[in-house]
Amino acid sequence: MATIKSTALKAVKETSQDVMERRIADGIRKRREQLGISANDLAERSGVSRAMVSKIERQEVSPTAALLGRLCNGLGITLSSLIASAESKAGQPVARAAEQPVWRDPGTGLVRTMVTPINTGSRIELVHVELPADSEVNYDVMPQPHYDQHVYVLQGKLTMTYGDETYELGAGDCIRSRFDVPHGFANRGRSACKYLVVIGR
């Protein structure tokens, strides 16, 4: 569920992944403080152990997409909003490609790019996802029915489970789903699958 980080490379220059994980850690802590809840409270809400919550906030471990999904559920926020909450500067209308936050799941190799300009107050989020061959990620129910998403496949084949249903999607296919239904994504092919996720709230 998480990858333990080595402390032997402290002197090495911070990578883009390090920056993203710091944003996530800061975002979790800030959101938790905004809600006025303790690490124990978040652990109870999300089903993630109190020890793991603390390690993630201290950047001692690299959380997987599934684990982050559970934490975001406990915080009542999407991952994109979580990352944005760690940014103190006001939002800009343009998100340059080189400046868009990119996060890699240490468990699956999934690469998630937050395309939408952050901190603009928009109720729409646009995320680009690259799912490696022979990998999958599953998300628990997010108890907020007003969140939904449209998934548009750009390249490759994507298998999406949504509740009790399974959908095989190809390039150009689009599917709508809600966050209050368990869902997951799998790439059974031999090459990466790329897709866009449009989240509305």
Predicted segments, located by residue:
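N-terminal flexible/basic segments that precede or flank functional cores
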Residues: 1-19, 162, 172-173, 193-196
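Short basic helix-loop element that most often maps to the first helix and adjoining turn
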Residues: 26-44
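Hydrophobic micro-packing sites on short alpha-helices
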Residues: 42, 67-75, 82-83
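Recognition helix of helix-turn-helix/homeodomain-like DNA-binding domains
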Residues: 47-61
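A short glycine-rich, His/Asp/Glu-containing loop-to-beta-strand
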Residues: 97, 101-141, 201
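Ligand-binding loop in jelly-roll beta-barrel domains
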Residues: 110-111, 122, 170-171, 179-201
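Short acidic-glycine-tyrosine-enriched beta hairpin
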Residues: 115, 163-178
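Short, conserved beta-strand element in jelly-roll/cupin
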Residues: 128-132, 143-160
